[in-house]
Amino acid sequence: ILELRARARRLKDRHDVSLVIIDYLQLLRSPSRWGLDNRQVEVAEISAGIKALAKELSIPIVVLAQLNRNPEARTGDSKGKPRLSDLRESGSIEQDADLVGLLWREEYYLDDDEERKELEGKAELVIAKQRNGPVGAVPLTSLKSITRFEDRAFEREEPSR
């Protein structure tokens, strides 16, 4: 986290960057926790440090993070659908974040090939937290071949006859 902080400050000073993206949170380490084995406390420190850095530099910092395995164990209509509580290793991530978006492709969790085919290419960006706005879901198109998501609202529709 110290190296990240120094690098972000340098980039802001030299190049006036307006956004920092961290891929991904669980790869970072906190020097004050080296040698200790409480990863949740360490992730909480890192999360708070990133939040403080964003405020200091007055820029948004987008942080990618892994989820735990809980979504895979869910059944019924919400099978696989991620929730805030699924953020891996710390509840502090959801506390510190201004916005939490979770990507979900229902087809990934289906066993039936026919159901899978019906949902192929469909995804959702679940806005699970938004400090200054509404939560909900944004329908997306998943382009797996190029690892890209697009807003489904802009898909071309066939004209009705």
Question: Where are the regions that the model predicts?
Answer:
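C-terminal regions of RecA-like/P-loop NTPase motor modules
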Residues: 1-19, 34, 48-58, 69-161
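Conserved Walker B
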Residues: 25
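Catalytic P-loop NTPase motifs of RecA-like helicase/translocase cores
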Residues: 28-29, 70
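Conserved ATPase-coupling elements of RecA-like P-loop NTPase cores
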Residues: 29-36
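…and closely analogous acidic/polar surface helices at protein-protein or active-site interfaces
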Residues: 42-47
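Conserved H-loop
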Residues: 64-66
